């Protein structure tokens, strides 16, 4: 299965099927074994069993992402072109996008209008947001971003919800969903969200961050998407797997 040749690798994300080949990306330090100098690593496969490690898809070479190209998502846009959506780590945490320069998806070019989201929405004290997940409902593209709410007696995880007509211009809507750690044990901040319709229901997966001895864990709820909010069937989530070793799930339709 997928295995990097060397150095730091974590958080696989952005699973994509294009022209008969699967692509997946990851946080990668190409020159050292520690978490730092983060770019987007890239693997490709014809069958999801045999993987080739490609050159990094994105590197931090602009002011708005100078502190790292952090996790995000990949989609096929309305023109049938793959598009990367990533967390741009600059002086503030924002969102950047990129487009391929070749059909093999080896070379990528950042959008000239980056960052498409410059920073977190007004009214929230936490400054970090990360890990986009993007999907389409009808004619509207939606994006959620992992976040946390600090300005309460009980800090908790949350998901910022944005929408767009073209995957370039994004408007903040509200919080898609908030946790309640006293009830659901979902922690103070959520990473690597996935929001996927399966059958007639939606599955929301989040990764709570480790905090005060509580380990990271991938949890999920099943529910509905109504009035641009997630409504869980049960306020208490389930654990995605038993031994707590899966922390950045990705999904793709084939």
Model-derived regions, located:
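Repeated scaffold domains used in trafficking and secretory/extracellular systems
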Residues: 247-249
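Acidic/histidine-rich catalytic neighborhood
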Residues: 194
